[in-house]
Amino acid sequence: MPAIVIVGAQWGDEGKGKATDLLGGRVDYVVKPNGGNNAGHTVVVNGEKYELKLLPAGILSPNAIPIIGNGCVVNLEALFDEIDALKARGADTSKLRVSANAHLVAPYHQVLDKVTERFLGKRAIGTTGRGIGPAYMDKVARLGIRVQDVFDESILRQKVEGSLAQKNELLVKVYNRRAIDVEEIVAYFLGFAERLQPLVIDSTIELNNALDDGKVVLMEGGQATYLDVDHGTYPFVTSSNPTAGGSSVGSGIGPTRITRVVGIIKAYTTRVGAGPFPTELFDEMGEYLQKTGGEFGVNTGRPRRCGWYDAVLARHAARINGFTDYFVTKLDVLTGIEKIPVCVAYDVDGVRHEEMPMTQTEFHHAKPIFEYLDGWTEDISGAKTLDDLPENARNYVLELEKMSGTRFSAIGVGPDRDQTIVVHDLIDG
């Protein structure tokens, strides 16, 4: 049966949570294959808004088993805070499972993240300060602590000692901070062991057995294509691979088992933090999109930078990920705009580029070349089919589809899961 991947096609905050929630009632497993509690997503169910960070959006789907995959980095304190907050609102979190091979975010990762950003000053990346980058650094440097280590005190202590031997030198001699005590960290992790134990599984075996048994598995990528450490706007990226290929690595599901890759893309573009953004708006229209679209980060509350739809980025994202479908969100936010610019190419130092520029310098110099599409004033929030849309809104969707090189299978016309036009079924279509 199908393994489906959902990937953000821009710089995050595209509405992946809504897409996962929409499909959640039809899938058996929802897996988060990468990232940590640095990437928030919002899900609206029956008019109630849920802001999730570490947990997969599938946690709100009554039939799906949500799994935090081996490619994630897990802050245990944040995990249980989020679980408790959902329980307090009546949500069932009992089916949640966590991969034994997922890495852990330690308190010292958060300390290092914050002091490093302060040290960098104007050169800072704009991280969330939640220790995600340092945790991934330890993973790659083979200094990481995994979920399974919490249940073996001697291994846990050995790993904490190895990691802090280096970090304390840095904290004390470079950043003028106090050294972190090994036993303090060991006690911190051991304090979660009893509550964590029932959640831990071999997720690779579980998920592949599920596929063998005819179950449907949905992989919900965190962050987005242009935050990918390899394919994003480096160095203004995250520390993992939130592109489609990273979903295989972060879940243990082989690439040949993936049957569908769905790109989630806004009808305009947003970005949080530093980095190049060719279509960014610095005027009242940017403020309008920000206010109308509710463009403020789930995790940090930071206002998102807003700009027009970028078809160059959309085509490139489709190529990198092998998208079979696009799910377009927030079309309703554009209602009332008379003429809507769409970026179809870049001007880089006088040369037209219809593809993503090769170098970082070229992309920083890229200026958008726009085509202008007619807007609409009618309320589209109740539309159920493409034919329900006013002519100009329908034309906008069809033109973007043509420019982006991948079929548009679903269009969001409001925040609720039911405010979605489904053109092609995202599981069987």
From Swiss-Prot:
Binding site for IMP: D13, E14, G15, K16, N38, A39, G40, H41, T128, R142, Q223, T238, R302
GO molecular-function term, one example from the UniProt record: magnesium ion binding
Keyword annotations of the record: Cytoplasm, GTP-binding, Ligase, Magnesium, Metal-binding, Nucleotide-binding, Purine biosynthesis
Subcellular location: Cytoplasm
Requisite cofactors: Mg(2+)
PANTHER family the UniProt entry points to: ADENYLOSUCCINATE SYNTHETASE
EC number(s) given by UniProt: 6.3.4.4
Amino acids binding GTP: 12-18, 40-42, 304, 330-332, 412-414
Family that this chain belongs to: Belongs to the adenylosuccinate synthetase family.
Chief localisation class: cytoplasm
Record function comment: Plays an important role in the de novo pathway of purine nucleotide biosynthesis. Catalyzes the first committed step in the biosynthesis of AMP from IMP.
GO biological process: 'de novo' AMP biosynthetic process; IMP metabolic process
Organism: Renibacterium salmoninarum (strain ATCC 33209 / DSM 20767 / JCM 11484 / NBRC 15589 / NCIMB 2235)
Name the record gives this protein: Adenylosuccinate synthetase
